[in-house]
Amino acid sequence: MFAVSYRSVLSGLSSRASALRRAAFGMLSLLAAGTAGAQNLPQSTTLTNGINTGGTSYLDGFTRTTPGWAVITYLRQSSLDAIKDSRGDDVPVFDRPRIDSTLLLTQVAYVTPYKLFGGAVGINTLLPLINLDASFGRNSIASLRDNGAGVGDLTFGPYLQMLPVIRNGRPVFSQRFEIDAIAPIGKFDRDRDLNQGAGYWSLVPQYAFTVFPTPNWEVSARINYIYNFRSERRPNLPPGFEFRNGQAGDAGWINFATSWEVVPDIRLGVNAYYLTQFRDNRTNGQRVADTRQSVFYAGPGGVWRMDANNMLFANLYLPVEVKNAASGNNVNLQYVHVF
C-alpha cells in the first residue's frame, strides 16, 4: 500500500524530468516530489506502511493467557500494478508500474505472570525483512528506484489479553487491548524512492475482539489508530528545497474477518480492511493539500488449526477502492507456534 500525492507528480512535470524521479518514500510509501498549489511545497512524509493492514484476521481476539512464549511468522507478497490519485484514478505519468514487495515478519510475544483488571499482561516485538523491486514501462515519464532488501522498522509494546467469556461450556467472546510504538530503525536511503524505513516514530493503540454467535461461526475485528511524530530525516526531495521537518497525518483503520468451521479445525471465510487518513500530511509545519490516503481491500481466506500449539492462516486481499496509494493484490500467510 504505497501512498502517493499525484498532484505533486503532475506539478513536478513543469520542471525538469529528473525531478520526477526524486520522489520520496517512507516504508513502502510513495512520496512524489513537486509542488502543491501555489506554495512550492513538496510532500516530504506519508503514512508508513509498517502497520497491520490485514495482517491479522480470524480469531484475532484470542491469544494465550498463561505465562509463556509464542512466535508468529508472517509472509506477505504484494504485487502492485497501479498508482491512484485522490479520486481513485490512475496517475498518467506512470506507464505500466510494477512494484513488488516481499515481507517476512517475525513476531515474538511473551505473556507475563502479571494480571491487570483480570487480564494477562504481555509484551510484543515485531521485526520485518523487506525486499523491494520496482519497474516501469518504456513510456513512463516518471519512475521510482527501490532500495533492494533490508530490515524494516521495529514495532514493540505491551498488551492486555482478557480472559474469554464462557457460556454453556464454550467461549463466546474474547478481547485484547494493545498499544505499540514503531521505531525508525529500518533501512533508509535519501537517494532512493522506495525504502524499508519510514524515518519517524509512530504510536498505535488498538483493540481486537472475537465473537462466536454460534459454535461454528466467528466474527473478528481489530480497530486501530496511528499517530505519527515529526520526522527531521530528509527524504528524496527536489534539489534546493530547504527541508526542516515532515509529518504524516494520523489515520484509523479496521481489520475485519468472519469464518465458518467447515470441518473440524478448518475454517473458511472472508477478510477485509479499510483505512482512512484523518489529516493531510505536512511539510515544514504546513499542510500539503489532497494527500490523505484511503484504501479498502477484501478477499477470501482460511485458517487451519494443526494441533494445540500450531495454526496456519491464509488471506488474499484484492483492491476495492484505493485513493492516494499504489494498488494491487496482497497474499498473506501467517504461522503461529505457541511454546
Regions found by a protein language model. Give the residues of each.
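Outer membrane beta-barrel transmembrane domains
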Residues: 76, 84-92, 232-339
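Residues that define the transmembrane beta-barrel architecture of outer-membrane proteins
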Residues: 98-106, 148-156, 173, 197-203, ...
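Transmembrane beta-barrel strands of outer-membrane/channel proteins
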Residues: 45-49, 71-79, 123-129, 177-183, ...
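Surface-exposed strand-loop-strand hairpins of Gram-negative outer-membrane beta-barrel proteins
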Residues: 40-50, 77-103, 143-146, 190-195
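Cleavable N-terminal export/targeting peptides
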Residues: 1-46
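Detector for outer-membrane/organellar transmembrane beta-barrel domains
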Residues: 172, 178-183, 189-283
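Short loop/turn motifs that connect adjacent beta-strands in outer-membrane beta-barrel proteins
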Residues: 59-68, 80, 113-121, 164-174, ...
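Residues on the lipid-exposed face of transmembrane beta-strands in outer-membrane beta-barrel proteins
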Residues: 60-61, 73, 106-110, 156-162, ...
